[in-house]
């Protein structure tokens, strides 16, 4: 269906792989502009005439008022966050807390607290980058 995003497991476009799709046109979600006169149905789905830049990013389902990721608009981009903890003086042992709130109050959905055990002593702020396991696919849309 024109305008519906989908994942594709090949660098080759679907119309070059599947004979029955040879008359179709597919575009990547790579931030490119497109023409409403060339792709009028796609222009109804993406009236900005620009496909979102999604290369290397994870898709997140829209919050739509739930409160777990409040204030987000559809197709908006969001930077990564880090787990962080201020460590005025961390001693060895268990029970150190990392608060991961991403701007969310402690009594709201989405606020999390993680405990960890330290094997060393130190000062400052520790940051840990987190990336879930993943697999790379092409992210495409049928344009015609």
Regions found by a protein language model. Give the residues of each.
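Low-complexity Ser/Thr/Gly/Asn-rich repetitive segments
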Residues: 1-144
């Amino acid at each position: 269906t024109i305008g519906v995003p989908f994942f594709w497991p090949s660098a080759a476009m679907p119309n070059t792989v599947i004979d029955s799709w040879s008359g179709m046109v597919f575009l990547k979600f790579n931030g490119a502009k497109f023409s409403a006169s060339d792709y009028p149905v796609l222009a109804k789905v993406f009236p900005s005439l620009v496909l979102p830049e999604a290369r290397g990013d994870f898709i997140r389902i829209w919050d739509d008022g739930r409160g777990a990721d409040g204030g987000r608009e559809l197709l908006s981009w969001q930077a990564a966050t880090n787990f962080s903890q201020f460590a005025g003086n961390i001693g060895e042992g268990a029970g150190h807390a990392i608060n991961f709130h991403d701007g969310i109050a402690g009594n709201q959905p989405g606020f999390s607290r993680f405990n960890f055990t330290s094997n060393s002593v130190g000062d400052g702020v520790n940051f840990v980058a987190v990336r879930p396991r993943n697999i790379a696919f092409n992210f495409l849309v049928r344009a015609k």
